[in-house]
């Protein structure tokens, strides 16, 4: 029987976390938990209810009454209550404001509690900004993905084009730099590499190369 370890994958925006995490989870037959989608879902409910992104108290109150859940599929489906928000949470409006919402301490605490519940049985791959440091500090395997700003902007540009979103590469680079600043400097659970995390620079690596590296590391932990 496969040992049910927890794998934490952290890193900045567009470093390839979600794509790699999905591949690793599928290969290991683990459950994938997209914590970024949870923060995007909260940002979306603020947008939908005309709540200012800076209004932490109002968003936290709304979140208490909101169920965020995942359903498996070829593309994992994200629901807010009964509404399928899988596509809308990837909109430019949500993308450009999620770091503001994610910086609110009460929002992070509420979502971290939910994320920890998901992980109680093990056998999960969870990606985000503070998984190895705050959400799953005892995860058996912690990965910290990096890539240059230029490479990440190029990846996000291609993603947007594939989804039919018009985009400006220079503007995307600027937005990623701004998100990095917010993520690294926020007071509550900033983005940082856990002391026991393994750093992987993905700038010159393909998605499969990154996934295979993590799978090799995971197999060592599973078989240890």
Swiss-Prot record:
InterPro entries xref list: Cytidylate_kin, Cytidylate_kinase_dom, P-loop_NTPase
Gene transcribed to yield this protein: cmk
Protein's cellular compartments: Cytoplasm
KW Transferase (keyword) present: yes
Record GO biological process: nucleobase-containing small molecule interconversion; pyrimidine nucleotide metabolic process
Family that this chain belongs to: Belongs to the cytidylate kinase family. Type 1 subfamily.
UniProt keyword Kinase present: yes
Pfam families membership: Cytidylate_kin (PF02224)
NCBIfam families per the UniProt record, alphabetical: cmk
Main location: cytoplasm
UniProt keyword annotations, A-Z: ATP-binding, Cytoplasm, Kinase, Nucleotide-binding, Transferase
Name of this protein: Cytidylate kinase
GO molecular function: ATP binding; CMP kinase activity; dCMP kinase activity
Gene Ontology CC annotations of this record: cytosol
EC class (word): transferase
EC number: 2.7.4.25
Binding residues annotated for ATP, in chain numbering: 11-19
